[in-house]
Amino acid sequence: MIKIIREMPHGVAALCLIQAFSTFSYAVQYSSLALFITKQLGIANLSANSIVGLFLSFSYIFQLIGGVIGSRFISNRLLFVTTILIQNMGLFFLAQANPSLLNIGLSLFMVGSGLNVTSSNSMLTQCFIPQDDRRESAFFLSYAGMNVGYCIGYIACGFFDYSNQYQYLLYASILTNSIALLIIIKNWAYLGDKNFPLPNLTKRNWYFIKNILAIAFI
């Protein structure tokens, strides 16, 4: 395994670690969100189920949006950094365990976690040329890192489900996201987009893009 990683281009090992650390926070939300809402915030089960359903549904929708934005309007590495920061803001609001902050916290985390899924895979793809056979092994390692993040996240959730004190779990998610952020910053030079079209856009294109982004933000 170590030999395979050493034969990979620069940035691949970093992306595998990023997958492991950044997946932890989503695993926490996926497995413990309903319990956090009902047991710690005291929200009714029916409302909690609706909130969790909307959260999961819109997370997949934002993955599609992230695929459109990445490499077109913003580089994938910058998109990933931005979305990690948005996730951490959402996790901080959730960690306050205040029902009035639930919607804004979940919304921020949902946007961040949804938009950055495609960016990490796109960065991994661009580490290779299309004819490079090592790309399949790289994606295998990347998904292995993702599974490690899910596994650790699920195990950690099991310890906190009995105490009903999810703040420490949410702060741990902020920590793992921050580690992923530091890794991508350290390997910034190796994870750039190839043939990034943004520098070649005309003023008219920029005006159109800014209007679209403003509408999306509103």
Task: For every predicted segment, state its role.
Residues A20, L101-N116:
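Hydrophobic core of transmembrane alpha-helices in multi-pass small-molecule transporters
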Residues Q29-S47:
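Short amphipathic helix-loop junctions that connect adjacent transmembrane helices
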Residues V52-G70, V117:
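Central cavity-lining transmembrane alpha-helices of secondary-active solute carriers
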Residues R72-I84:
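Cytoplasmic membrane-interface "Motif A"-like loop-to-helix N-cap segments
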Residues T82-N103:
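C-terminal ends and interior cores of transmembrane alpha-helices
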Residues L115-P130:
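Intracellular juxtamembrane helix-capping segments at the cytosolic ends
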Residues R134-I155, D161, T176-A180:
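Glycine-rich segments within core transmembrane alpha-helices of 12-TM secondary carriers
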